[in-house]
C-alpha cells in the first residue's frame, strides 16, 4: 500500500520544495518562486497530479525565462563567450629571446620554423629584430617585398609551402615607431595558423614584453660564453617581474660543444632549469648554408644544429598542442 506521507515528501521535493520537519512534524512549505499552486500537494492528495503539475512547471521554466526578470541567463552568456573564443582560436605562439646579442636567437628561430613547416605544420615566423633583422638576406628575398614597416598592412612572404615570414622593416629608424603597432597585430598574425614563432632583437623593449605576455612558450637562448648566461639570468628576473610564468621557459644552450667553458648542467643550475636543450655548433654560419643550398637542402643534411633543433621541437611542441616526430634515421640532439 502506498505511504501517502512518503509520496508527499517525494513528489513535493520533485516539484521544487522540501518539507521541513521540526519535532518530527512537517511544517508547511512556502511555494517556490513562480510555482503553480496546483503543484502543492495537500495531505491525502493525488501524487500523480502533483507530479504532472511539477513537470508542467519545469517545461514552463525551460521555455520562458520570465523567472529571471527578463535578464539574460549569466550561464548562457558565459557559454556563448566561450564558444566565440573557441571559434576564433589563435595559433600557439613561441617567443625566442636571449639576454644578450650574438647568442644565435635568429638561427634557432629559423631552424625551428622551417622544421615545423617540414612536418606539415602551417608556420609563420615573425622577424622581431626590427632594426637589424636580416632574414631577407638569409633567404635571398627581394628588399621591395612587404615588410613590418607597416604591421597593419603587412602580408606574410611565403618562403616554402607552409612556412611564411613577416619581414623586418627595411629601414632601422622606423623600428621604434612600429613596435607598438606590431605588438597589437600579433593576434591577427596568429589567426588561421597552426604555429607562430617570434624572434626578438638584442635590445628588450615593450614589444619583447608583449610577446612574453602573449606567448605559450618562450625559448631562452644562451651560448658558450659565461656572459650570455649572466645576461640570461637578468632576463629571467625581468620575466619574473613581468609575471610571466616560469613554466613557459625552455632553456636552449646554442652552439654547445664538449669543449665549452660551461657545461649544460652548470647552465641549468644558473637559470634554475630542470632541462637544458643543447644545439651543437654547426661549424658553419647558418645564413651562408641557407644562401648556398636553400632551406630544404639544409634540413635534409646531417647538420648537428639541425638535429639539435629537431630534438628541441620534439620536446617543446607537445607542450603547446602540436605534435612533432623526430626522424629515426637522424642523430638526436642532446638534453643535459
Model-derived features with residue positions:
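G-domain G4 guanine-recognition motif of GTPases
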Residues: 223, 249-261, 279-284
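Inter-motif core of Ras-like GTPase G domains
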Residues: 205-226
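Walker A (P-loop) phosphate-binding motif
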Residues: 83-123
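Acidic-aromatic/histidine active-site loop/patch
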Residues: 1-93, 143-152, 237, 241, ...
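Beta-strand-loop-alpha "switch" segments that mediate conformational coupling across diverse proteins
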Residues: 255, 267-297, 309
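Switch II (G3) loop of P-loop NTPases
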Residues: 166-174, 182-210
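Well-ordered beta-strand positions
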Residues: 195, 217-220, 275-277
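Phosphate-binding loop that captures ATP/GTP phosphates
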Residues: 116-170, 175
Amino acid at each position: 500500500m502506498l505511504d501517502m506521507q512518503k509520496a508527499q515528501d517525494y513528489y513535493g521535493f520533485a516539484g521544487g520544495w522540501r518539507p521541513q520537519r521540526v519535532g518530527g512534524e512537517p511544517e508547511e512549505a512556502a511555494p517556490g518562486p513562480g510555482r503553480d499552486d496546483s503543484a502543492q500537494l495537500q495531505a491525502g492528495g493525488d501524487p500523480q497530479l502533483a507530479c504532472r503539475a511539477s513537470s508542467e512547471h519545469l517545461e514552463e521554466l525551460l521555455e520562458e525565462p520570465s523567472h529571471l526578470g527578463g535578464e539574460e541567463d549569466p550561464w548562457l552568456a558565459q557559454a556563448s563567450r566561450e564558444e566565440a573564443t573557441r571559434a576564433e582560436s589563435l595559433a600557439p605562439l613561441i617567443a625566442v629571446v636571449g639576454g644578450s646579442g650574438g647568442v644565435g636567437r635568429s638561427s634557432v628561430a629559423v631552424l625551428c620554423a622551417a622544421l615545423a613547416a617540414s612536418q606539415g605544420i602551417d608556420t609563420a615566423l615573425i622577424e622581431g629584430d626590427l632594426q637589424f633583422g636580416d632574414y631577407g638576406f638569409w633567404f635571398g628575398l627581394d628588399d621591395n617585398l612587404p615588410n613590418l614597416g607597416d604591421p597593419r598592412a603587412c602580408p606574410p612572404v611565403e618562403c616554402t609551402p607552409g612556412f611564411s615570414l613577416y619581414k623586418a622593416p627595411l629601414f632601422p629608424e622606423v623600428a621604434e615607431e612600429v613596435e607598438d603597432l606590431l605588438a597589437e597585430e600579433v593576434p591577427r598574425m596568429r589567426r588561421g595558423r597552426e604555429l607562430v614563432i617570434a624572434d626578438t632583437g638584442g635590445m628588450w623593449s615593450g614589444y619583447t614584453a608583449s610577446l612574453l605576455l602573449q606567448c605559450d612558450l618562450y625559448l631562452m637562448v644562451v651560448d658558450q660564453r659565461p656572459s650570455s648566461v649572466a645576461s640570461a639570468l637578468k632576463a629571467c628576473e625581468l620575466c619574473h617581474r613581468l609575471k610571466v610564468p616560469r613554466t613557459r621557459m625552455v632553456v636552449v644552450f646554442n652552439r654547445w660543444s664538449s669543449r665549452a667553458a660551461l657545461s649544460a648542467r652548470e647552465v641549468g643550475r644558473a637559470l634554475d632549469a630542470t632541462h637544458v636543450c643543447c644545439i651543437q655548433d654547426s661549424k658553419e654560419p647558418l645564413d651562408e648554408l641557407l644562401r648556398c643550398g636553400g632551406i630544404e637542402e639544409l634540413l635534409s643534411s646531417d647538420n648537428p644544429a639541425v638535429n639539435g633543433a629537431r630534438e628541441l621541437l620534439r620536446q617543446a611542441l607537445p607542450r603547446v598542442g602540436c605534435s612533432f616526430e623526430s626522424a629515426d634515421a637522424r642523430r638526436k640532439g642532446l638534453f643535459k
